[in-house]
């Protein structure tokens, strides 16, 4: 069952229909923009093109949600593919959004490495020739894995020691969320998301708008409103109601269902048991 509150409902353009009506010759820049728009709106095709992976419908729907929401939680049963779908999301996010910094964290380094290793397995397959060309240098240390891709990085770290406090990220992927202490999430992990991905561009726009306001050309209310693009993805199996996972789950559900809420951030919550998995 899928549920979407009215405040999240919006008119969705049929991009494929519009693109199918294009005729004639496209200039190089326009062709690139058109292709990227098509690939972004057809995640099944894009994933298959880059990696040879054929997504199940529930996996494609989940990927779309991860792209369109700031805070996402997948409470899935064992063997339902949480780490796999996170690995696919990581490389797609970096392909579509250059300079993205993704931080994968877990209660142990072994947990964090699992998603990173999934990405490696996908990239090293014979079908992932195109995807492999997007990746660059790879660094593996005892307490940190890092892989450069499209101007950004995918980094896996353990949640131990003071070292993690120095990291910054646009996307935070937390595996085994139920095992992470609440104070670590609030005081250590959430501050990772403070740096906008396009800080340089935002500063330039602010400087231009400061001058325009001084000249009286625009007013303070006319300033550009930047969309919040930071993301946190929580992956976990189900836990007891007295644990922080359930508390966070209820908090996000309430924010989704609250009709009066005017929060800038958007939320997505998904539950999946092994009985609901497709047979093939």
Tell me what each language-model feature is.
Residues 2-280:
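Phosphate/NTP-binding elements of NTP-utilizing enzymes
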């Amino acid at each position: 069952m899928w549920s979407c509150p009215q405040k999240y409902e919006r008119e969705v353009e049929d991009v494929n229909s519009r693109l199918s009506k294009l005729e004639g010759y496209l200039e190089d820049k326009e062709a690139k923009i058109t292709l990227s728009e098509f690939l972004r709106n057809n995640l099944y095709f894009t994933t298959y093109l880059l990696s040879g992976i054929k997504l199940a419908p529930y996996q494609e729907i989940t990927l779309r949600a991860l792209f369109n929401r700031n805070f996402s939680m997948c409470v899935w049963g064992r063997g339902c593919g949480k780490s796999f779908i996170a690995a696919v999301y990581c490389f797609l996010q970096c392909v579509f959004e250059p300079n993205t910094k993704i931080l994968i964290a877990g209660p142990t380094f072994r947990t964090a490495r699992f998603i990173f290793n999934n990405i490696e397995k996908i990239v090293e397959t014979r079908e992932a020739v195109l995807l492999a060309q997007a990746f660059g240098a790879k660094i593996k240390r005892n307490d940190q894995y890092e892989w450069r891709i499209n101007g950004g990085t995918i980094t896996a770290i353990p949640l131990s020691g003071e070292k993690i406090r120095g990291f910054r990220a646009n996307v935070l992927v937390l595996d085994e969320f139920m095992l992470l202490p609440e104070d670590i999430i609030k005081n250590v992990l959430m501050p990772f998301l403070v740096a906008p991905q396009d800080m340089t561009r935002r500063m330039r726009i602010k400087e231009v708008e400061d001058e325009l306001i001084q000249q009286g050309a625009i007013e303070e209310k006319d300033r550009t409103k930047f969309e919040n693009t930071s993301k946190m993805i929580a992956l976990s199996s189900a836990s007891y109601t007295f644990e922080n996972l359930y508390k966070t789950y209820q908090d996000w559900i309430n924010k989704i269902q609250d009709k009066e809420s005017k929060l800038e951030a958007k939320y997505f919550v998904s539950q999946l048991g092994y009985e609901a998995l497709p047979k093939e």
